[in-house]
């Protein structure tokens, strides 16, 4: 006698771990690019994040009297830690990433019951809380190290992360101040603060958008794009969410360029100067907090693109990917409810 079960009809205990591992592998080129342009601080943040994430997952497993591998082997906590570590400034104080990992795993993930139960993307919950609570530390990005007169050594990187200054006593903001013509360390931040004074052409001709610095941000985004396309090719993620997110943002940004020329950065600069590619392929596609229906994925991705556009163009935060993902997460139950495909043989 056969047992009747509903789909899915294939099961694998290591399917989640395989998914998470592929996502992390696809992030490695961008991680390498980020370390190349911003120095050793990237690896230090990743090391702290991964170490603490594994420790928390083990502790939660013991508290719930589950096998240690129950929470650790699925790699979800490790992936969350890696995403958050890449998202914060490489030379942010160590306690920033510590608070972020605790919030992401304990508050945003395990307080809901663990993997598969959380309503919001854990890494983005932590990032948004850190950005609102510690704006100075979370905006302390350094320019690419090749633009600095004295790039931080590995010892300087450790000193910056754990004490706030290099071995010579320079803080991140003092190192940034040594580079002429740069008011903020990221292109979107600089454009936000300099647009009224310099205009679009002046901003695009400033050091932050020319030469090595511009190439640094572009190459990091191109690496995320390549990794995302790999995930689509391997069918780890679906194409609908990133396509809808990028398409909606590009459409609205392009219309703004046509209707209000010379008031904002052009579409290409907007797409490749912030966290857009990272968000589209590695954050918005989180299978737990994203929509699960084919039409729902398109709506979900389009909503994120819309929110990013509104916040970037009319809000106070220059990037806005984290807040946009969280706002779209709120809409997921409603989206899934109204986009469920009709079952074969059922009525309208």
Curated annotation (Swiss-Prot):
Membrane-spanning ranges: 15-35, 36-56, 67-87, 88-108, 125-145, 212-232, 241-261, 265-285, 298-318, 320-340
FMN phosphoryl threonine sites (modified residues): 186
Assigned GO CC terms: plasma membrane
Superkingdom in the source lineage: Bacteria
Obligatory cofactor(s): FMN
Keywords (A to Z) from UniProt: Cell inner membrane, Cell membrane, Electron transport, Flavoprotein, FMN, Membrane, Phosphoprotein, Translocase, Transmembrane, Transmembrane helix, Transport
Bilayer topology term: Multi-pass membrane protein
Gene Ontology process terms (BP): electron transport chain; transmembrane transport
Primary localization class, coarse: membrane
Keyword match Transport: yes
Location of this chain's protein in the cell: Cell inner membrane
Enzyme Commission identifier(s): 7.-.-.-
Enzyme class: translocase
Quaternary structure annotation from Swiss-Prot or TrEMBL: The complex is composed of six subunits: RnfA, RnfB, RnfC, RnfD, RnfE and RnfG.
Family to which this protein belongs: Belongs to the NqrB/RnfD family.
NCBIfam families: PRK00816.1 (NF002011), rnfD (TIGR01946)
Biological function: Part of a membrane-bound complex that couples electron transfer with translocation of ions across the membrane.
Name of the protein in question: Ion-translocating oxidoreductase complex subunit D
Originating species: Actinobacillus pleuropneumoniae serotype 5b (strain L20)
Lineage of the organism: Bacteria, Pseudomonadati, Pseudomonadota, Gammaproteobacteria, Pasteurellales
């Amino acid at each position: 006698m056969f047992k009747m079960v509903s789909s899915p009809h294939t099961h694998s205990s290591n399917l989640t771990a395989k998914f998470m591992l592929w996502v992390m592998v696809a992030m490695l080129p961008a991680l390498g690019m980020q370390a190349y342009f911003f120095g050793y601080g990237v690896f230090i943040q990743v090391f702290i994040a991964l170490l603490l994430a594994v420790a928390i997952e083990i502790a939660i497993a013991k508290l719930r009297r589950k096998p240690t591998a129950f929470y650790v082997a699925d790699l979800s906590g490790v992936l969350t830690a890696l995403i958050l570590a890449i998202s914060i400034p490489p030379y942010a104080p160590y306690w920033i990433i510590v608070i972020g990992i605790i919030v992401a795993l304990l508050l945003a993930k395990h307080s809901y019951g663990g993997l598969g139960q959380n309503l919001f993307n854990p890494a983005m919950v932590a990032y948004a809380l850190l950005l609102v609570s510690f704006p100075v530390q979370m905006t302390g990005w350094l320019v690419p190290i090749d633009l600095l007169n004295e790039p931080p050594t590995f010892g300087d990187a450790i000193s910056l992360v754990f004490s706030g200054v290099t071995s010579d006593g320079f803080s991140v903001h003092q190192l940034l101040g040594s580079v002429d013509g740069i008011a903020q360390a990221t292109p979107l931040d600089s454009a936000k603060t300099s647009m009224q004074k310099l205009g679009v052409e002046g901003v695009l001709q400033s050091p932050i958008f020319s030469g090595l610095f511009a190439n640094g941000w572009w190459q990091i985004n191109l690496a995320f794009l390549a990794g995302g396309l790999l995930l689509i090719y391997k069918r780890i993620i679906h194409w609908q969410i990133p396509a809808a997110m990028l398409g909606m943002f590009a459409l609205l940004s392009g219309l703004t360029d046509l209707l209000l020329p010379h008031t904002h950065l052009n579409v290409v600069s907007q797409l490749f100067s912030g966290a857009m590619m990272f968000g589209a392929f590695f954050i918005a596609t989180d299978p737990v907090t994203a929509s699960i229906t084919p039409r729902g994925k398109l709506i979900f991705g389009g909503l994120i693109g819309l929110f990013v556009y509104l916040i970037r163009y009319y809000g106070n935060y220059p990037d806005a990917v984290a807040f946009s993902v969280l706002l779209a997460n709120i809409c997921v139950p409603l989206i899934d409810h109204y986009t469920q495909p009709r079952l074969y043989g059922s009525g309208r």
